[in-house]
Design a protein with these regions (language model features):
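Outer-membrane beta-barrel "beta-signal"
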Residues: 221-226, 257-270
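Membrane-embedded beta-strands of outer-membrane beta-barrel proteins
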Residues: 88, 119, 150, 178-180, ...
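Residues that define the transmembrane beta-barrel architecture of outer-membrane proteins
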Residues: 64-66, 82-86, 113-115, 144-148, ...
Length: 270
């Protein structure tokens, strides 16, 4: 028995068939994209593993760093003798709080003739600038002198390194120290470093051959070659001068008030 089918019925069947094909194609594409996304996520997790909560908690928010730097460790052929001289820094702490030790001194004929130690707390106060505060001890020459002080260190415009500190000591003594240094990169390994240091005192200290006012200044020019960043030999020249009452005290002891000499040494850190 044949059942008559109208034209409208045939059209409806065709539309249903076409819709079913579209749904099947959509489901196939969705499955393919889903597998691709899962594969990409697996690759990402393999390359960048996610930290578990316990691992994240074990990582310190503010890690501790440390460093020891001998900026100068050198031989100097001064007018009266050959001298071993050093200028070193050591620090340990976090980005926000550090302990800093500065040490400068000289040895001549097996005896320490100059020795200055500074123990400072350091905290950043601006971009490229730190506030420093602490104590200082001068053990040579003469009688040991102790100070407390506050100052700044950092980079001025044109990358000029600055250390400036004001000190208050025993018996009403006051002092100020200033160090300026600039590193000129001639190549990636050849570096020229001019440096100036000066001391100013508020009172005479004849026992330690220190006069009131602008006391002394050192100006040097050093040329180093960095075999590695951590190790660099250098040569240079340095000029030292005493002024004012300090120069008068030196003359009264038959000591030179001006001197220029060659230096050769090593700069290293770890």
């Amino acid at each position: 028995v044949q059942v008559p089918v109208s034209t409208e019925g045939i059209s409806m069947v065709k539309r249903i068939h076409k819709a079913a094909r579209r749904v099947s194609l959509f489901m196939l594409l969705s499955a393919l994209f889903g597998m691709t996304a899962l594969h990409a996520e697996d690759e990402r997790d393999a390359a960048f593993p996610r930290l578990s909560t316990s691992m994240s908690q074990d990582m310190p928010d503010d890690p501790v760093y440390w460093m020891l730097l001998f900026d100068e460790f050198e031989w100097q052929n001064q007018r009266d003798a050959n001298v071993l001289s050093w200028d070193a820094h050591a620090w340990i702490g976090t980005d926000m709080h550090r302990g800093l030790l500065r040490a400068e001194g000289e040895r001549e004929d097996g005896h320490t003739t100059e020795n200055r130690l500074e123990l400072l707390w350091v905290r950043p106060v601006a971009a490229y600038w730190d506030l420093v505060a602490g104590v200082r001890m001068d053990t040579e020459p003469g009688t040991t002198r102790n100070y407390v002080g506050i100052g700044v260190q950092g980079l001025a415009p044109q990358w000029l390194h600055v250390e400036a500190t004001a000190w208050a000591g025993e018996r009403g003594q006051t002092a100020a120290t200033l160090k300026l240094k600039y590193e000129l990169l001639l190549t990636n390994r050849l570096i020229l470093t001019p440096k100036i240091e000066t001391d100013i005192y508020g009172k005479d200290d004849t026992v330690n051959e220190i006069g009131k006012g602008f006391s002394e200044m050192n100006a040097g020019l050093r040329f180093r070659y960095e075999i590695r960043r951590e190790f660099a030999p250098y040569v240079g020249v340095e000029w030292t001068g005493k002024f004012g009452d300090t120069a008068d005290l030196a003359r009264s002891n038959d000591e030179a008030v001006r001197d220029a000499h060659f230096v050769a040494g090593l700069r290293f850190w770890f």
